Amino acid sequence: MEINGKERHFEYLIKAYDDICALCPDEDMSRIGEKFSNPSESVDMAISCAVILNKCYEDHQHHISPDYKPDYLTREDFDFEPVSIMHEVTGEIMKAFREGNRQTVKTEPVNKKGKNA
């Protein structure tokens, strides 16, 4: 998504888990919804999560390719964005959470031998 004129990406990996837990009541990730459901805290929470998840994405890209220069999203990048952008930001955050929590299983092809092969 575009924020402050730049395309931004978000990624939820182990690196981001502790930082996001620190934002939750009692540092309990299962209570993150309390922050998003409180109107006076939801915008601040979304911005904080976006900054953390973007840093995770940028650091991951740099780790994969050391020539990649991270360009981190900052809280100030949101200063002159319309409030309506927060719906899209929240959607992107939730998408990153879903992707980061998705379990994948690698399987090897079955090598059948014998009579039924």
Predicted feature residues:
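Charged interaction scaffolds used for protein-protein
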Residues: 2-3, 22, 26-37, 61-117
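Glycine-centered positions within short beta-strands or beta-hairpins
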Residues: 5-7
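Active-site-adjacent beta-strand anchor residues
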Residues: 10
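Residue-level signal for threonine
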Residues: 13
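A short local loop/turn or secondary-structure capping micro-motif enriched for an aromatic residue
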Residues: 17-19
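Short, hydrophobic/amphipathic alpha-helical patches that form generic packing surfaces
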Residues: 44-56, 91, 95
